[in-house]
A protein has these predicted regions:
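A short glycine-rich, Lys/Arg-flanked "PGG" loop and its adjoining helix->strand segment in the class I
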Residues: 117-129
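A conserved beta-strand element that flanks and buttresses the S-adenosyl-L-methionine
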Residues: 103
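Conserved Class I S-adenosyl-L-methionine
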Residues: 182-251
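Short catalytic micro-motifs in class I SAM-dependent methyltransferases
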Residues: 106-110
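Class I SAM-dependent methyltransferase SAM/SAH-binding core
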Residues: 41-91
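Short alpha-helix
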Residues: 164-179
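Conserved class I S-adenosyl-L-methionine
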Residues: 1-38, 51-55, 72-75, 132-163, 206
Length: 251
């Protein structure tokens, strides 16, 4: 499992940095409710380094970030001083009905089935009536676009041996329904700089970065790497993934 405290210093640089974060924040903006009287209370649950969180902050909003990693939270606090708290997304340190928006960006796919269900339940608990949960869905599916020759090769094996995704849209909708949340809107955004070259796919498959390689077996993974090695332009990044965002409204 990734040591987030140890990774904190260079976490953003290995995950698309400002370009990807900016695209995510811009997409979230299109789903946020129109400005109303008073202050819109936004909580970024699992905020990581705060690279998206800080982009949501502006006059008329009270934005806080929550993360369980002290290392990531420290980076986030340097971006939003006094607005970051240590805490778990399955036990948010917030009163029931106390916020207008909960965002979860690239979070649910990292959690187990049980914890992702708890995270959605917690979002439902802390949201006020009419509030929104805005979350990425199907995060890992985004890398397997039809225009990507390398990903299509990998996708055949992944479809057979990959684990069920805890952030599938239909699953998130069902989890939300149990908490009185209903799908209100969807949008997409491009994961800038996240396209993967055939050589990088081979590197990932050879290491332990992909969870299903153990189930596939070394012989099958080696054959997959050999097929990838036969593609042209080994170091050319393929198209950037297109991520999905869903907004669920509390009734």
């Amino acid at each position: 499992m990734l040591d987030y405290d140890r990774e904190a210093a260079h976490y953003d640089a290995t995950r698309g940095g400002n370009a990807r974060a900016g695209a995510a924040a811009d997409a979230i903006e299109t789903l946020l409710p129109a400005a109303a009287e008073g202050v819109t209370r936004i909580v970024d649950a699992g905020c990581g380094t705060g690279i998206v969180t800080v982009r949501l902050a502006r006059p008329g909003r009270s934005v806080i970030g929550i993360d369980r990693s002290a290392g990531l939270a420290a980076v986030a606090a340097s971006r939003l001083p006094g607005r970051i708290a240590l805490g778990s997304v399955i036990r948010l340190p917030l009163a029931s009905g106390s916020v207008d928006v909960v965002t979860m960006v690239w979070l649910l796919h990292l959690l187990s089935a049980a914890d992702s269900a708890e995270a959605v339940a917690e979002a439902g608990r802390v949201l006020s009536p009419g509030g929104l949960l805005i979350t990425t869905v199907g995060k890992n599916d985004a890398a397997f676009g039809p225009a990507d020759d390398a990903a299509m090769i990998v996708g055949v094996v992944r479809a057979r041996f990959g684990h069920d995704q805890t952030d599938r849209l239909n699953r998130v909708i069902e989890l939300g329904r149990r908490q009185g949340l209903a799908l209100a809107a969807q949008t997409t955004f491009v994961g800038m700089g996240q396209g993967v070259s055939p050589r990088r796919w081979r590197h990932r498959l050879a290491g332990d970065a992909i969870s299903w390689t153990g189930a596939a077996g070394r012989e099958r993974v080696d054959a997959l790497c050999a097929e990838l090695a036969g593609l042209s332009d080994q170091d050319r990044a393929r198209p950037d993934p297109v991520y999905q965002l869903a907004a669920l409204r509390k009734g």
